[in-house]
């Protein structure tokens, strides 16, 4: 079988100021392409593509169907909490039964290629979401007796939020569908007004024995008008009139201009491949003029997080954008903050009854409003002024990496400065003077841990906010009348609570329980209010970090927790542990999927993106007005290089590491800011312009650079070339689903001899009807039983319909959440425990002396996360 497209080659070469960078981008990215040697069997493992607005995820669904699950980031309820809506999927229905298949995402061209073998022939295809048009293109060629039927399956239950429904809301009306000429369409009217339309057209463009079909599909959304169908039709007519060569050319041109904004290479195929898949993901999920990225991007499915979360999620979603020198993608976030500023002020009036504040709850709708659903029901737990301050820190990052003073001084256009003032204003009436004469905060929430007075989360954010406002007020001579108040707050604010284990959650609340969020260490990273370069600080941070990772055996330390830990270790200059934690993230198969997406029961894609930021932190840091070269590198990484990573102060930084040492650095100033650098050379080095270099002591140097000037620091030859690292015999194309490796996907069931197959089951609770008890005994790998959302305990019980002797139970678990369980049988009217344990894993067989019973119950006594779930629960004689 052959795929349709051959990969083109594009080169990027510079020769600026003794610099030579020659990268064959097509060949370099090719080694990071995710490859599926067997077809993914579910959404979470699928190949994905997107353009910052619409997206698709491709996987096999059933014996003869490939499903392109469709999403569009701005299709929302427009009522209540304004959550995302589900759209449905475009099906490639084949005449034959699928025997084998492969997929490859060609990163260089942002294109999915696939080949499928059936019992009637072969299909090869390519699919892409155009970089600049809201259009999915699929081209498919068939051989033999194979034929394709294209069908759009509209989502009948549009509501994507699996946790919080509003039964009293008027249902959305049924969708309508039809055909006009070559265009087929499905239109959905919303109960709240407006419509969205999925429309497509097909073209049998090759009548030869290799039959080629071409499909264009678009998604349009309008509110409050009903014009989406008209817009969808116009889009299809426009793109179908374009020569296909031009359509492909403009798509590739966008992506080939995008990748060379910066370059990173490390001598580890798994980590380098993961990084470049995140760079692909960023541009697939974000555009400067697109919607703000939530937890799902354009690839949504049923979820418990169908809104914007601001107590960690949006912050880490955008975290890799800045150092990667891809600031244009971050503009979608700036636009969200700027355009919704009045709503943030309205939130403060509603929550704190102040007119000059600005805030959110821990989650908002896509208008920045608190909404009328679960956020309000949870007050005061999720009414936390720190969440919005942390959200604004992201805006400040954009400013610091760009040094665009308009982001601060043009206050009519840009809301940052005034919103930060309002966010800090929300703390004013909360602060009280204690017996020690210090300012103290009341009981507030430390994200996901619990409540505590003077909690370190809010103390660190209040400090950062006041410090930042004073810095900007002084730099831009804003003469803000509130400046003395911020100074007094900083002067009087109580110290961070600590104990023998380091930073506490808050005053009187030690860190006693395993917990996935590093909210009590925000002052270390990303706020950098406390420097680990001071020995007394480093000691307390080391204690805190070790305690966080090990208390209760780290049972609640998740994949993204490890990515955060990697940042923290890199901040301390500990490259060995930074790498260890980054590997821990990548190897956490419970959460990190073969396609690099991150699933915690539902998609939370930001938890993969933050791992890209972790690698950047090992390579380059620039907090505290100091550029640090290779600050967190492990000894095993003898070589590494990067080109045009961006540092705070608007510097482009390139560097080469050879034989475990820094050998070459280039710094280019984009704004003429003061430049201080820790080059991390071993021994003496040379500057190509000595007059611009001044030693400050302790490995710190000042560089005198005007705007658009560059300087090179080096050992050996000044003319060194930035090239990809040699991966040696490492397995390239690490990511993607490999044959027989789907341990965390749909399980391979062996139910021969099951005594419980299809027998009636009951349960303590179910997540929804789609996850009821009988799904756990139906013998189908694609279905499962799940405890109700938020619950960590529950049971499932099988009625064997007569007393039967058995000595084994097989359990197939979804995502490995169960931490404690028991197995019971009913003896007359009494339940008797016959087995206990702590972990199930993907599959586990429990054996025990034979018992005779009609009823058998599996009890989940505790879980690492809510809604633990089993694919199957089966009883065997022996």
Regions found by a protein language model. Name each.
Residues 526, 734-806, 812-820, 836, ...:
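Disordered, acidic Ser/Thr/Pro-rich linker "stalks" and the adjacent N-terminal cap
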Residues 310-346, 354-358, 380-402, 414, ...:
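Active-site core of glycosidic bond-cleaving carbohydrate-active enzymes
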Residues 817-829:
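Short, surface-exposed beta-strand/strand-loop-strand elements in extracellular ectodomains
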Residues 859-866:
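Short beta-strand-plus-loop segments that form exposed binding edges in beta-rich domains
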Residues 422-472:
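Acidic/histidine-rich catalytic neighborhood
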Residues 86-93, 605-654, 658:
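Catalytic cores of secreted or luminal carbohydrate-active enzymes
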Residues 660-749, 841:
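C-terminal beta-sandwich/jelly-roll accessory domains of carbohydrate-active enzymes
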């Amino acid at each position: 079988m052959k795929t349709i497209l051959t990969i083109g080659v594009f080169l990027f070469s510079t020769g600026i100021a003794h610099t030579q960078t020659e990268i064959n981008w097509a060949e370099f990215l090719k080694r990071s392409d995710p490859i599926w040697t067997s077809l993914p069997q579910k959404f979470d493992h699928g190949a994905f593509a997107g353009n910052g607005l619409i997206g698709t995820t491709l996987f096999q669904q059933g014996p003869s169907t490939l499903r392109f699950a469709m999403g569009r980031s701005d299709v929302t309820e427009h009522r209540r909490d304004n959550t995302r809506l589900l759209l449905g999927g475009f099906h490639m229905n084949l005449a034959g039964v699928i025997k084998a298949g492969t997929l490859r995402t060609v990163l260089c061209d942002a294109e999915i290629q696939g080949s499928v073998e059936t019992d009637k022939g072969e299909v090869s295809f390519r699919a892409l979401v155009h970089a600049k048009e809201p259009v999915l293109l699929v081209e498919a060629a068939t051989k033999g007796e194979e034929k394709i039927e294209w069908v759009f399956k509209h989502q009948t239950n549009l509501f994507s939020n699996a946790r919080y429904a509003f039964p009293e809301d008027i249902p959305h009306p049924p969708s309508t569908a039809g055909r006009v000429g070559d265009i087929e369409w499905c239109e959905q009217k919303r109960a709240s007004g407006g419509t969205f339309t999925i429309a497509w057209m097909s073209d049998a463009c090759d009548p030869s024995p290799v039959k080629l079909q071409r499909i264009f599909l678009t998604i349009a959304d309008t509110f409050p008008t009903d014009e989406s169908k008209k817009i969808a039709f116009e889009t299809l007519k426009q793109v179908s009139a374009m020569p296909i060569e031009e359509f492909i050319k403009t798509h590739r041109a966008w992506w080939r201009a995008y990748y060379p904004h910066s370059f990173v290479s490390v001598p580890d195929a798994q980590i380098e491949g993961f990084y470049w898949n995140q760079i692909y993901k960023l541009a697939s999920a974000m555009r400067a003029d697109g919607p703000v990225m939530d937890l799902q991007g354009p690839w949504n499915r049923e979820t418990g997080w169908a809104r914007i979360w601001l107590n960690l999620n949006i912050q880490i979603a955008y975290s890799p954008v800045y150092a990667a020198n891809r600031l244009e993608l971050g503009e979608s976030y700036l636009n969200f903050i700027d355009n919704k500023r009045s709503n943030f002020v309205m939130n403060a009036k509603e929550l704190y009854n102040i007119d000059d504040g600005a805030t959110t709850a821990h989650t908002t709708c896509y208008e920045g409003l608190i909404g009328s659903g679960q956020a309000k029901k949870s007050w005061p737990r999720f009414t936390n002024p720190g969440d919005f301050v942390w959200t604004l820190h992201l805006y400040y990052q954009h400013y610091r990496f760009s040094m665009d003073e308009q982001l601060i001084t043009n206050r009519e256009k840009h809301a940052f400065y005034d919103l930060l003032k309002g966010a800090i204003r929300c703390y004013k009436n909360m602060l009280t003077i204690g017996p020690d004469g210090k300012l103290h905060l009341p009981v507030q929430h430390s994200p996901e841990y619990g409540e505590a007075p003077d909690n370190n989360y809010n103390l660190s954010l209040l400090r950062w906010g006041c410090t930042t406002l004073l810095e900007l007020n002084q730099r831009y001579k804003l003469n803000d009348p509130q400046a003395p108040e911020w100074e007094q707050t900083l002067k009087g604010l109580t110290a961070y609570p600590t104990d023998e284990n380091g930073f506490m959650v808050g005053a009187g609340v030690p860190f006693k329980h395993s917990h996935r969020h590093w909210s009590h260490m925000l002052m270390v990273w990303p706020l950098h209010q406390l420097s680990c370069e001071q020995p007394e600080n480093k000691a307390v941070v080391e204690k805190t970090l070790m305690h966080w990772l090990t208390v209760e055996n780290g049972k609640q330390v998740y994949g993204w927790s490890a990515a955060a830990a990697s940042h923290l270790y890199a901040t301390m200059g500990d490259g060995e542990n930074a790498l260890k934690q980054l590997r821990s993230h990548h190897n956490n198969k419970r959460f990190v999927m073969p396609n690099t997406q991150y699933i915690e029961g539902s998609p939370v894609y930001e938890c993969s993106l933050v791992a890209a930021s972790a690698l950047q932190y090992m390579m380059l840091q620039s907090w505290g007005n100091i550029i640090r070269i290779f600050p967190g590198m492990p000894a095993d990484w003898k070589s590494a290089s990067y080109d045009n990573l961006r540092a705070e102060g608007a510097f482009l930084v390139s560097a080469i590491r050879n034989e475990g040492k820094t050998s070459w650095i280039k710094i280019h100033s984009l704004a003429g800011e003061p430049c201080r650098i820790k080059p991390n050379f071993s021994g003496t080095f040379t500057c190509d312009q000595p007059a611009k270099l001044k030693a400050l002591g302790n490995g710190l140097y000042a560089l005198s650079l005007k705007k658009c000037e560059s300087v090179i620091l080096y050992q050996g030859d000044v003319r060194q070339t930035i090239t990809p690292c040699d991966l040696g015999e490492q397995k390239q194309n690490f990511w993607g689903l490999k044959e027989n490796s789907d341990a965390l996907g749909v399980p391979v069931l062996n139910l021969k001899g099951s005594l419980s197959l299809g027998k009636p089951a009951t349960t303590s609770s179910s997540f929804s009807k789609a996850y009821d008890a009988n799904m756990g005994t139906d013998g189908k790998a694609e279905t499962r039983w799940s405890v109700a959302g938020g619950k960590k305990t529950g049971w499932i019980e099988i009625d064997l319909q007569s007393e039967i002797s058995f000595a084994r139970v097989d359990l197939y678990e979804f995502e490995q959440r169960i931490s404690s369980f028991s197995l019971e049988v009913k003896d007359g009217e009494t339940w008797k425990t016959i087995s206990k344990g702590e972990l199930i894993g993907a599959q586990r067989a429990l054996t025990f002396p034979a018992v005779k019973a009609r009823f058998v119950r599996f009890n989940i006594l505790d879980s690492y996360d809510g809604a633990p779930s089993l694919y199957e629960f089966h009883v065997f004689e022996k």
